[in-house]
Amino acid sequence: MLFTIIYDLFHFPARSIFWGAELILALFIYYKLKIPSGTYFAVLVLFLMNIFGEIFFGLFYIIQNFDKFIHLFSSFAVCTLFYSIFEKKISSKKILILFSFTIVLSIELIWEITEYFADNWFHLILAGVHIAGEQAFKPIEMVSSYEDTIYDMLLNFIGGTIFAITALFLTRTKKKLAKNSKKECHHKV
């Protein structure tokens, strides 16, 4: 991982800041937060998909819609992360689900705005889907940055919605199971 940041630092300085921040966040989550291992595993997979998709294997350029899958999966994984972090602090499960969903969509909005300004001010080519070889100085744009931004935000919304529906279903199922176990306890007495 450190190699990735160093490699990126010399080739794409602005992106290395992103990778470094993501690595620090992953280490913080692992060492400081008490979250379920499944949630941590999902966040780790997301981190590795970003690294391998961009740097090592170029999966963004090889596998069609790899970027789109990451946006769908990332919103689900990060919603789950925020749910796990704030589960003990917010007692209402519905508000907790809505809070997690809203935070993730807000982060996505900030990220897409950052991509827009990074592309327009620093010509970093963060938005859009491009084809680029090692020697390419001007990548070929496959999907425009505006279209890419809309699809990214839509897929993050869909991933967050899948999280919300799943979390609501699991919350209701858990309540029903708790209610049924209380009834069984009363019948046994």
Regions found by a protein language model. Name each.
Residues 1-150, 157-189:
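Bulky hydrophobic segments
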